[in-house]
């Protein structure tokens, strides 16, 4: 997914939390939405860069009854990390009171992620896919890994099989050199390169795209 789509998703979710919230000064609405977008994007990217691909996959493939509901997301450490980061930004950058900032973050971030997970899992929504998201986070490394699998004689191998390796579905066996750790570290490398490209990940980076 490109950042623009994520930005629009955040914007859609930000009505009550940001736009109609008197605690967030109106002149900062767009910047706050951009900041939230950046928090989610860089949070996911940092997870992959730190070798946490498995955590992202389980976050996105958790389709049990309330697995991706915004309430159960509050129990997820990745989500809590994002909430803390975003809340800190609101307080430090926009002088929003700590309690209010925490309320905004705890409302907006799980909502956005919940929508993102639902859209990513919705086959009729072509704009969002876990494949597109990971490819964007890793600067194209995900597609590269899948392509290599196909080239090494595993011609039917696709992105679902890659995910299957982590969730226990899909083709477990396939040509050599495709150990899970190898894949995790390749994608981590791609995400690290993207992190560096984006420097501190400020608002301008966000507007320029991943």
What are these regions (language model features)?
Residues 2-210:
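A structural "flexibility-hinge" signal
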């Amino acid at each position: 997914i490109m950042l623009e789509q994520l930005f629009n998703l955040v914007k859609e979710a930000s009505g009550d939390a940001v736009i109609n919230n008197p605690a967030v000064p109106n002149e900062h609405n767009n910047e706050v939405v951009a900041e939230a977008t950046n928090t989610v994007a860089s949070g996911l990217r940092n997870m992959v860069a730190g070798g946490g691909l498995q955590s992202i996959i389980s976050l996105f493939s958790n389709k049990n009854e309330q697995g991706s509901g915004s309430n159960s997301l509050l129990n997820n450490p990745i989500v809590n990390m994002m909430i803390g980061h975003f809340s800190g930004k609101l307080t430090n950058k926009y002088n929003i009171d700590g309690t209010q900032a925490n309320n905004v973050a705890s409302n907006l971030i799980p909502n956005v992620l919940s929508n993102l997970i639902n859209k990513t899992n919705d086959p009729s929504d072509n704009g969002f896919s876990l494949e597109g998201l990971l490819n964007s986070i890793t600067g194209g490394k995900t597609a590269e890994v899948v392509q290599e699998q196909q080239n090494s004689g595993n011609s039917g191998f696709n992105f679902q099989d890659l995910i299957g390796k982590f969730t226990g579905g899909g083709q477990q066996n396939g040509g050599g050199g495709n150990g899970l750790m190898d894949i995790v570290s390749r994608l981590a490398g791609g995400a690290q390169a993207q992190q560096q490209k984006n420097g501190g990940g400020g608002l301008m980076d966000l507007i320029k795209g991943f």
